[in-house]
Design a protein with these regions (language model features):
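Conserved pre-ATP/AMP-binding loop-to-beta segment of ANL
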Residues: 19-22, 153-187, 194, 217-223
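Conserved AMP-binding/adenylate-forming core of the ANL superfamily
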Residues: 24-71, 79, 96-102, 151-156, ...
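ANL superfamily adenylate-forming
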Residues: 28-31, 121-179, 292-345
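Conserved AMP-binding A3 loop
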Residues: 36-40, 183-209
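AMP-binding/adenylate-forming catalytic core of the ANL superfamily
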Residues: 113, 438, 443-444, 454, ...
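Conserved ATP-binding/catalytic segment of the ANL
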Residues: 188, 410, 421-429, 433-487, ...
Length: 636
């Protein structure tokens, strides 16, 4: 049986193996040089921080919130948190709403916050509402340091003093950490109505790295530029720890005062750092493609036509990836491919540093045309699939096995099954909910036993995503079996709280489900209480069957939805970006008879969305975004 390593065991193992190799790269903004930190140096710094945290009074199992842009010290500091036996609570720098930050810091019971100068104003704003927080630790120097704030250098100094007299105590602390101890509480889709702080253990992380080895690998000299937020476990597993396990290295994009400034730093960082591998999400993939094509168009119509001709032929030659060059006509295409690669695509790849081998795509599902595009230019984008509750990797395409449109080969060792709405396991090719079982499955949701019990049943993680197995290895994800919303930028959100409130707080709404699958905005599908709406129309002196009355009914439904927006009486209950911007009013209620409810009286989302696909597509048009439209009028 494989040894159940902690992250501490894991780091010690690979630092011993690759001690003098570079692990971290960071750009020195004064010299414009990317400077390395070796494996050994990374661990020494992490241990000094860990000892400093112990000197500060951090106890084993205590929570430390982490709010910062990517940098070397993000990785080193987190290792310090873990070596101190504490639990890291990484927070997204996208969180701009005070109540979202307050909720996470309070709900996690964080006693300390580690942050940067750019995020400090947010932290200072929430501290009056977070009485449990004792200290704020800063990565950067600030001129107006408060009494409860300290710089990371002070923690390191305290750590050196602690190690000088208490080294045995420090070693005892980190050696006491077990594989089932919590490493992380990840808030990826929590709401105040239904908190989802995902508990990930040390073994969850190390197990998923071992599983990731079954699908993808890198070389010892490879460099990865991490352009995704470091707070997500995807960056941890596919980035920090997998690269460490191969003796490879990682770099982070220099931060900026804002998200836009950080985005502007990506392109020059790629050119300077010349990565071999990058993690990506669909939004970034689209931006890279757009940038490449803009550059091509500036070279004139002749070059642009040649580029398009080369691209068309490369896509035809590659087919579905795994079967490229298998037709008779491809015998004649192959010399062309070599020529196109040398004359055109090599120059295109220079736009991404010139050393790129492949992308690993995560977050949301990657458009198949984007996969074909990147494969054609010689930098495959291997689609993967996962979720934080699985730490997160469940499957991935790889150089050895890839099929465009698939989510890749399921990692090993891990069990997987596909269940229909009644819990019956499905054969190859049949769709249902994706369920997985393995050491990468989370310990549960922090302070939420009900959601834990609903999500992990007899060790099986019910992902809420719909898919099917092509064969014993290849997984296809086709949508959501349950509720998860996914925005165009890959951000995810669990909408049950909004849905429940829409029904509970309105006598005019009997049922509601939200939908967002990388779309411009979220929409709501609601079943109206027609009797209550008719009574409302009559109270206005209108005949409920007339168009005038139905318009008033729809306007009332819009008011009910708007009560959660600014100016509404329930404003602030939920993040505004996830509130529905359009409403589909459905003609019939959900029942067991029409199969929209299962035997447990739960809505079968996939069936509802399939039945009202046309309504949903219409909701993403200018006419459909207005609740007063022909489809909605016809439903009343």
């Amino acid at each position: 049986m494989k040894e159940r390593l902690t992250i501490i065991d894991f780091v010690e193992k690979y630092v011993a193996k690759y001690s003098k190799s570079p692990f971290l790269w960071e750009k020195n903004l004064d010299t414009n040089v990317w400077e390395p930190t070796t494996y050994e140096e990374t661990l020494i710094k992490a241990k000094r921080i860990a000892a400093g945290l112990m000197a500060l009074g951090v106890q084993k199992g205590e929570k430390i919130s982490y709010l910062s842009e990517g940098r070397d010290m993000w990785v080193i500091g987190e290792l310090g948190v873990l070596y101190a036996g504490a639990v890291n609570v990484p927070l997204s720098i996208k969180l701009g709403e005070t109540n979202d930050l307050v909720f996470r810091v309070k709900h996690s019971d964080s006693k300390y916050i580690i942050t940067s100068k750019f995020q400090l104003p947010k932290v200072r704003a929430i501290l009056p509402e977070c009485p449990l927080v004792e200290k704020v630790i800063l990565f950067d120097e600030v001129p107006d340091m408060k009494e409860n704030e300290m710089h990371i250098s002070e923690i390191i100094r305290m750590g050196d003093e602690f190690l000088a007299s208490n080294e045995a105590l420090f070693i005892q602390r980190y050696k006491s950490i077990g594989p089932d101890d919590y490493a992380n509480i990840s808030y990826t889709s929590g709401t105040t109505a239904d908190p989802k702080g995902i508990l990930l253990t040390h073994r969850n992380y190390t197990a998923n790295v071992e599983q990731a080895h079954s699908v993808i690998g890198v070389d010892e000299n490879d460099k990865m530029l991490i352009i995704l937020p470091l707070d997500h476990c995807f960056a941890h597993v596919a980035g920090f720890y997998t690269m460490m396990s191969y003796g490879a290295s990682i770099g982070t994009v220099p931060s900026g005062k804002s998200g836009k400034e950080a985005l502007r730093n990506i392109s020059p960082s790629i050119q300077e750092f010349k990565p071999n591998v990058m993690l990506s999400v669909p939004t970034l993939a689209k931006n890279f493609k757009k940038s490449i094509e803009t550059s091509i168009s500036k070279k004139g119509p002749v070059i642009e036509k040649l580029y398009n001709f080369a691209l068309k032929n490369a896509i035809a030659y590659n087919k579905e990836g795994y079967n490229k060059g298998t037709q008779f006509v491809d015998i004649f295409r192959k010399p062309l491919m070599l020529l196109f690669d040398k004359l055109i695509f090599k120059a295109v790849r220079q736009g991404l540093g010139g050393q790129m081998k492949f992308f690993v795509g995560g977050g949301a599902l990657l458009d198949i045309d984007l996969q074909r595009y990147y494969y054609a230019i010689g930098i495959p984008m291997y689609q993967g699939y996962g979720l934080s509750e699985a730490t997160p990797i469940i499957s991935a395409n790889s150089p050895h096995r890839h099929i465009f449109g698939s989510s890749g080969k399921v990692v090993q060792p891990m069990e997987i099954k596909i269940l229909d709405a009644d819990g019956v396991e499905q054969p190859f090719g049949s769709k249902g909910e994706i369920c997985v079982k393995g050491e990468n499955v989370m310990a549960g949701y922090w302070k939420n036993p009900k959601s834990t019990a609903d999500t992990v049943v007899d060790g099986w993680l019910h992902t809420g995503d719909m898919g099917y197995m092509r064969d014993a290895e290849m997984l296809y994800v086709v949508g959501r079996f349950k509720s998860l919303l996914i925005a165009a930028d890959g951000e995810k959100y669990s909408p049950e709280g909004i849905e429940e409130n829409l029904v509970e707080n309105s006598k005019y709404i009997d049922g509601a489900i939200l939908h967002n699958s990388q779309d411009p905005y979220t929409i709501a599908l609601i079943t109206p209480n027609k009797e209550a709406l008719k009574a409302y129309a009559k109270s206005l002196g209108l005949d409920p069957s007339t168009k005038e009355a139905k318009v008033k009914m729809l306007e009332l439904l819009q008011e009910e939805v708007n009560m959660y927006r600014k100016g509404g009486r329930l404003y602030g209950e939920f993040p505004e970006r996830w509130l529905p911007a359009a409403v589909c009013v459905l003609p019939e209620p959900w029942t067991e008879q029409n199969h929209f409810l299962n035997s447990s009286m739960k809505v079968v989302r996939g069936r509802v969305e399939e039945a009202y696909k046309a309504n949903m597509e219409f909701a993403y048009t200018p006419e459909g975004k207005n609740i007063v439209n022909d489809m909605n009028l016809a439903s009343l």
